[in-house]
Amino acid sequence: MKVAVLXAAGGIQALALLLKTSLYDIAPVTPGVAVDLSHIPTDVKIKGFSGEDATPALEGADVVLISAGVARKPGMDRSDLFNVNAGIVKNLVQQIAKTCPQACIGIITNPVNTTVAIAAEVLKKAGVYDKNKLF
């Protein structure tokens, strides 16, 4: 089973430590995170990818976790988060729909109540929506 963690350069690194699989973020430090995690002595292989194209991280993925986006800062309200994070989630889900449409997708990008709905609409438009695989 292959798990892809999208936005692996942020605070999700602790989870990536447990999963040790395919990491992606637009931040150029992501391959370095992968190297750091690869030094942990297990049989699991880990790869890190950065840049605008998440395809290499998504190829063959059975599970995709999206944690990408900006965190809420003091003075921000949920609509501020939505304005930024909705576009990020939309872009990543479009790439998932093309590269690994059969994958289960977990979204923890805030505001979750709207980012999951956006993901559902993107998947429906691509003809690959499965209500049992989006959470």
UniProtKB/Swiss-Prot annotation:
Is Transcription tagged as a keyword?
no
Give me the residues that bind NAD(+), please: X7, A8, A9, G10, G11, I12, D25, N85, I108, T109, N110
Q: Which UniProt keywords apply?
A: NAD, Oxidoreductase, Tricarboxylic acid cycle
- Top EC class per UniProt? oxidoreductase
Keyword match Oxidoreductase: yes
**GO CC entries:** cytoplasm
The catalysed reaction is:
(S)-malate + NAD(+) = oxaloacetate + NADH + H(+)
Q: Which InterPro entries match?
A: Lactate/malate_DH_N, NAD(P)-bd_dom_sf
Q: Name one GO biological process term.
A: tricarboxylic acid cycle
EC number(s) per UniProt?
1.1.1.37
Tell me the residue numbers annotated for binding substrate: R72, R78, N110
Q: Which Pfam families match?
A: Ldh_1_N
GO MF annotations for this entry? Answer: L-malate dehydrogenase (NAD+) activity
Task of the protein: Catalyzes the reversible oxidation of malate to oxaloacetate.
**Family, as annotated:** Belongs to the LDH/MDH superfamily. MDH type 1 family.
- Summarize the subunit comment: Homodimer.
- Official protein name in the record: Malate dehydrogenase
The gene that this protein is the product of is: mdh
